[in-house]
């Protein structure tokens, strides 16, 4: 680290603590904001402060929100009969960007009795008819799906999970064997 530049070094360290940012990138970012574009630096600092102060989990689904209920849970145009279970609020952002789903969400970031009771209350309150699991494909996810399906089997729900397979533009040699196996077993007719 640069001697005599404590504030700069602290900024570099803060950037380097972020996911996917290495030390070289952290130095470039810090230099850019301190020297090349101080206005962007001040705007970034302000935006970070506001985001930390005002963004919180939605009281119903766990999505990112600036209000008690997020825009999705408040939207009367959404299909309120289907509920997509995700692992993280980031997953909601990704699914919303895809414009492939118009129902509600529930963030299941950990499997405990409190979360399961909250999920059950939402299912009953909103008269949910289908749970869609959009979880990372793994043995743990399969166990979670099986557990929830078993726990809520008396609630007259349809259970489904998102399809698995080969991403667009990826060569077969670069696909893991589990994904390749599932893609073959769950192939569709054309």
Curated annotation (Swiss-Prot):
Cited InterPro entries: DNA_Rcmb_RecR, Rcmb_RecR, Rcmb_RecR_Znf, TOPRIM_dom, TOPRIM_RecR
PROSITE patterns noted in UniProt: RECR, TOPRIM
Gene Ontology BP, a term: DNA recombination
Family matches, as Gene3D superfamilies: 3.40.1360.10, RecR Domain 1
Gene Ontology MF terms: DNA binding; zinc ion binding
Domain Toprim: 81-167
Zinc finger (C4-type): 58-73
Keyword line: DNA damage, DNA recombination, DNA repair, Metal-binding, Zinc, Zinc-finger
PANTHER family reported for this sequence: RECOMBINATION PROTEIN RECR
Family statement drawn from the similarity comment of this UniProt entry: Belongs to the RecR family.
Described purpose of this protein according to its UniProt entry: May play a role in DNA repair. It seems to be involved in an RecBC-independent recombinational process of DNA repair. It may act with RecF and RecO.
Protein name: Recombination protein RecR
Organism per entry: Campylobacter jejuni subsp. jejuni serotype O:6 (strain 81116 / NCTC 11828)
Lineage of producing organism: Bacteria, Pseudomonadati, Campylobacterota, Epsilonproteobacteria, Campylobacterales
């Amino acid at each position: 680290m640069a001697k005599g530049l404590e504030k700069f070094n602290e900024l570099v360290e803060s950037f380097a603590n972020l996911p996917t940012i290495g030390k070289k990138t952290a130095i470039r970012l810090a230099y850019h904001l301190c020297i090349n574009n101080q206005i962007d630096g001040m705007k970034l600092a302000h935006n970070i402060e506001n985001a930390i102060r005002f963004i919180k989990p939605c009281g119903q689904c766990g999505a990112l929100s600036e209000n008690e209920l997020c825009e999705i849970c408040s939207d009367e145009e959404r299909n309120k009969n289907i509920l997509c279970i995700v692992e993280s609020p980031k997953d909601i952002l990704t699914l919303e960007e895809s414009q492939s789903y118009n129902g509600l969400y529930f963030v299941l970031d950990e499997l405990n009795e409190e979360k399961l009771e909250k999920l059950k209350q939402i299912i009953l309150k909103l008269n949910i008819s289908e749970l869609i699991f959009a979880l990372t494909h793994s043995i743990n996810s399969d166990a979670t799906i099986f557990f929830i399906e078993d726990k809520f089997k008396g609630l007259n729900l349809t259970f489904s999970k998102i399809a698995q397979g080969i991403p667009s533009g990826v060569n077969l040699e670069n696909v893991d064997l589990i994904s390749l196996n599932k893609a073959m077993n769950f192939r569709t007719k054309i």
